[in-house]
A protein has these predicted regions:
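N-terminal Rossmann-like NAD(P) cofactor-binding subdomain of oxidoreductases
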Residues: 1-173
C-alpha cells in the first residue's frame, strides 16, 4: 500500500494491478485510513474487483501463486514484490515467467541481479541486465546513506552498528 500511496500522484506511472490476499473493499479502507501515515487526502473508492484512487482504476487480484498471475496479458513492466515470501531468485523468477519485465523486491534477496540503496549505489543500475532488483533491508536503507556521507567526507575504514528491530513474523521472541 505504501508504494502505491507514495507513487499514485505521479501521472507518469500507470498503476495497473494490486495483488493481495484481501478484497478491494478492505484494501480501499486500509489505503484511505492508514494508522501511521494518516488519512489519504484524495478520493478512494472500490468496485468488486478494483480500487479507484483519485479516478484512477487499479485492478485487484488475489492470486497466491506468481506463475498464475496475468502479467503478460496486463503488459506489466515492473512488479513490486513486497509479500516477504518471494525473496530468492527462483521464486521471484515466477513473476518474470508470468510476463513481468522486472521485479523489485522490497526486502533483502538471495541472488538478485543487483541490490540497490537509493542515494548510495543506484547509479549502478543497468536496465539491460538488471531484471531482479532487491531494495535491501530497512536497516540497510537507514544506515547506508549515513555511512556514505561519512565515508565520502571523512573516510570510513571499519564500522559497527547495533539495531533494535520490531518483532516480525520471521523473528523469534525466545
Amino acid at each position: 500500500r505504501l508504494v502505491l500511496r507514495a507513487g499514485i500522484k505521479d501521472k507518469s506511472i500507470n498503476w495497473v494491478c494490486v495483488n493481495d490476499v484481501t478484497d478491494a473493499k478492505t484494501l480501499a479502507h486500509l489505503f484511505k485510513y492508514d494508522s501511521v501515515h494518516g488519512k489519504y487526502n484524495g478520493t478512494v473508492e472500490h468496485t468488486d474487483d478494483s480500487l479507484v484512487i483519485d479516478g484512477r482504476k487499479i485492478k485487484v487480484l488475489s492470486v497466491l501463486e506468481p506463475t498464475k498471475l496475468p502479467w503478460k496479458d496486463m503488459k506489466i513492466d515492473v512488479v513490486v514484490e513486497s509479500t516477504g515470501k518471494f525473496t530468492d531468485r527462483e521464486s521471484v523468477q515466477q513473476h518474470l515467467n508470468a510476463g513481468a519485465k522486472k521485479v523489485l523486491i522490497s526486502a533483502p534477496a538471495k541472488n538478485p541481479d543487483i541490490t540497490i540503496v537509493m542515494g548510495v549505489n543506484d547509479k549502478m543500475y543497468d536496465k539491460k541486465k538488471h531484471h531482479i532488483v532487491s531494495n535491501a533491508s530497512c536497516t540497510t536503507n537507514c544506515l547506508a546513506p549515513v555511512v556514505k556521507v561519512l565515508h565520502d567526507n571523512f573516510g570510513v575504514k571499519r564500522g559497527f552498528m547495533t539495531t533494535i528491530h520490531a518483532y516480525t513474523a520471521d523473528k523469534s521472541l525466545l
